[in-house]
Amino acid sequence: MGRKKIQITRIMDERNRQVTFTKRKFGLMKKAYELSVLCDCEIALIIFNSSNKLFQYASTDMDKVLLKYTEYNEPHESRTNSDIVETLRKKGLNGCESPDDQRYFEEETFSKLIEDSDFVFKRDPALNKKENRGCDSPDPDGSYVLTPHTEEKYKKINEEFDNMMRSHKISPGLPQQTFPMSVTVPVSNPNTLPYSSPGNTMVTASLAASASLTDARMLSPPPTTLHRNVVSPGLPQRPPSTGNAGVMLCSSDLSVPNGAGTSPVGNGFVNPRASPSHLGPTGGNVLGKVMPTKSPPPPGGNLVMNSRKPDLRVVIPPSSKGMMPPLNTQRVTSSQGTQPLATPIVSVATPSLAPQGLIYSAMPTAYNTDYPLTSADLSMLQGFNSPGILPLGQVSAWQQHHVGQAALSSFVATGQLSQGSNLSINTNQNINIKSEPISPPRDRITPSGFQSHQHHQHQPRPEMDSLSSSSSSYDGSDREDVRNDFHSPIGLGRPANNEDRDSPSVKRMRMDAWVT
């Protein structure tokens, strides 16, 4: 909005003249004040209106300025209206208002302030007594009018600010968010898994070392009545916590002297001197045992197995006869039909592994005909015997007995997995029930393992091959026979012959339970 330039002539309207006088008089005093402060000078204004009413302004004291004025006799600059008009004509303004003159309001807006012109000076005595010297201008508040339009704008701004604060205000009553963490540790609950003893837990080594899981209700899998849990071989594997390869432990009640637990060590066996916090809740009679596989894991695995995927299987057996299922057999297949499921097994008779600090199993492996368990070895197991484990006095006779008569009530198969990968546990819901004969076939099973003596004679191997060999995948006719009157912490493995190794057919695992 530009300035309205007016002709500098006498205002004929008395009302407008009074308004203009009030406005410009104050402007003149304001300019005098600014000049006195900025330029450090003394100013005195003496104004008589048309009614001969006096208005004066002095930067300090009017009497002092007037005294100095009367005593001053030197030549000085003195101007009148004619001098100012002449100067304005030279600048080409032709008597119009100078653009430097500030106009606060239009003259007609001050018509209502005619009667209040004298009230301004009475309200603010600083204009007369020169007390307001620290501010820019002694402008009284009465010269500013709050119009209804301006007041409406202020109210609108306040409402918008309040709405913004309410929209961004965080409610203090909101509960703190919690994020559930999924754990791949299925815990067998007796109410949901009837084929497992209370407290049987499958724990990966790195997870068991980081947390102790004690509440079985919080870790129970969904209530799908499964009887066994099967490890899916095609899933990625958990990184190892021991610096070697990832080892999955099926932890159970292991009677170790001095209350020490077990934990995986670098050689793939179970260390009895480790901290007991490395194992979860225990229950049952299972002894962890690590065995190499014939099919090595992917690159990045352990030093022996370095080319193929491992084949894993996990079975959680009952802890007593009362927990056995009805007289039928369950058949669990892998979640990937094309992936073979075989238990990687390390022979405890391998001469390349140091026997110190190891827990030997009572199970004769595929090559234990050259390295049988002696009485000294059996005496080492006296501290580990429990009511659920095979009595050690019967081990020798049991080794001579047919393997088909030995049942697996507690079985742990722990695979030597590759480094830097995850180990996942799946519960397979494909359960096929099939009747089985009372006794297993005897043509393929011998007391020396799951391979006949003829295979040992026609396929001789060095003793060091026990680290790189493993039990192959089970085909449709192979199976493991389980009896409910025998409890032993053993892991069985069967090296496959050349026909099974070269067979292109789809391999699968069968775990059958039969009762005599």
Swiss-Prot record:
Q: Which UniProt keywords apply?
A: Activator, Developmental protein, DNA-binding, Nucleus, Phosphoprotein, Transcription, Transcription regulation
* Basic and acidic residues bias: start-end ranges: 476-486, 497-516
Q: Which residues form the MADS-box domain?
A: 3-57
* Residues recorded with modification Phosphothreonine: T343
- Segments for region (Disordered): 318-339, 420-516
Q: Could you tell me which residues carry Phosphoserine?
A: S386
- In its UniProt entry, what is this protein called? Myocyte-specific enhancer factor 2A homolog
InterPro entries reported in the protein's UniProt record? HJURP_C, MEF2-like_N, TF_MADSbox, TF_MADSbox_sf
**PROSITE patterns xrefs:** MADS_BOX_1 (PS00350), MADS_BOX_2 (PS50066)
State the source organism's domain of life. Answer: Eukaryota
Matching entries from SUPFAM superfamilies are given as: SRF-like (SSF55455)
Query: What tissues contain this protein?
Result: Restricted to the somitic mesoderm of early embryos. Expressed in the head region of neurula stage embryos and in body muscle (myotomes) of the tadpole. Expressed in all tissues examined in the adult.
Ranges for the region named Interaction with hdac9 are: 1-100
The answer to whether UniProt assigns keyword Calcium to this entry is: no
